[in-house]
Amino acid sequence: MTTSSHGTAPFLPGEHGELLQALAEQRTLLLITVRDITDAQAAQRTTVSELTLGGIVKHLTRCEQVWTQIMVKGEGELPEGMLDLEQYRMVEGETLAGLLEQYTAAAQGTEESVAALPDLGRSVPLPKTPWSPPETVHWSARRILLHVIRETAQHGGHADIIREALDGASTTAQR
């Protein structure tokens, strides 16, 4: 199985492949959005939001790592760092290139883990979080993957707004 740094998922037949391809397409749009920016630009706030382009890449990396771990382990345990607010911002010493390398590695890990799952209908208990109901909630592996796709698409839209405010570029104008 191979994955390019441009967000192309490996070919897998059926639902596994279709969902991974949808995720890869959203990753590709994010990579277009952050193309040709400096580390300083990646760390710069351009709206009243705390979000930055680098922070979005960092968060989506952590998002894939955490949700893949939840999906694969299926233990309902809160992964270390899931609630860490540092995942939303670039810190001193981080570079966009380094964050993108980590994002590519997380993407490959997601793809390998999903490809190895025999059943996307597998029920997984979600970890307890401050926003979850008191009872244990279960999602299918499929729903977890759909959540990762939604997170990537939603934050990709945020990234596009931040980029346009930064230098006038947008994802569609760069294609």
Predicted features along the sequence, with ranges:
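Acidic/histidine-rich alpha-helical segments that form the ligand environment
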Residues: 88-127, 140-153
